[in-house]
Amino acid sequence: MQQKQDIKGFTILELLVVITIVAVVSAVGYPNFMDWRLDREMRASMEKVSSMLRSINTQAQRGNFSIVQFMVKPSSNSTEFISKGMSKSAESTIANTSGQTVTCRIVTSGYWTNQQVEYSNNDVATNIDANGAVCFSKDTRYFLKEGKLSSLLNVSIEGRLTSNYIIICTTENATKSGGKCATNQLDGLEKPAYLVEWNRFGNISKFKWGGSGWSRL
């Protein structure tokens, strides 16, 4: 004779306990997940900027362009990053024309041989609230800055001051600082934030904001 199996389901109380536990775990874990996601987004944008700077400098070193430009074009909710190049013949024409000098001109047409070598649009903010650009050349003869990148405040990195950088932070953080990323803790810079530094030789360095200072990556 087959015995009856004593099979019981969950009681309403047990289900409520399980639901409560899941809710508590979710409430604790969700903020951490959001922080992680934001950090990944900021870091990805920083890596893109770093890659674009290295790439355009490599093209200058190879002689593809005589002068190259990295341009930052911020808007209210995103930032465009654009690299451009000027051919040797175009640079020579400007340099040899009376009354003209080679500059890091910010334009949307003309002047540059290639107006868009590389382009990226990211939902991030930077430490500038209007267009800015930096230009490099193979022989370091040209190391020029234009627009907002020509008048940056010095920031302290590894015990030294530099004005050759771009900071990437969330648009929410930038809103608290007048529409652009702050440059230090006192002015309101918050995590996650990243910084890309360059020099006239085209060397690129990357840093992460730790809450009170910059750490090299």
Language-model-detected regions and their locations in the chain:
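N-terminal helix-rich module
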Residues: 28-35, 39, 47, 58, ...
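G2-box/ATP-lid motif of Bergerat-fold
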Residues: 65-68
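N-terminal single-pass transmembrane signal-anchor helix
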Residues: 1-38, 42, 52
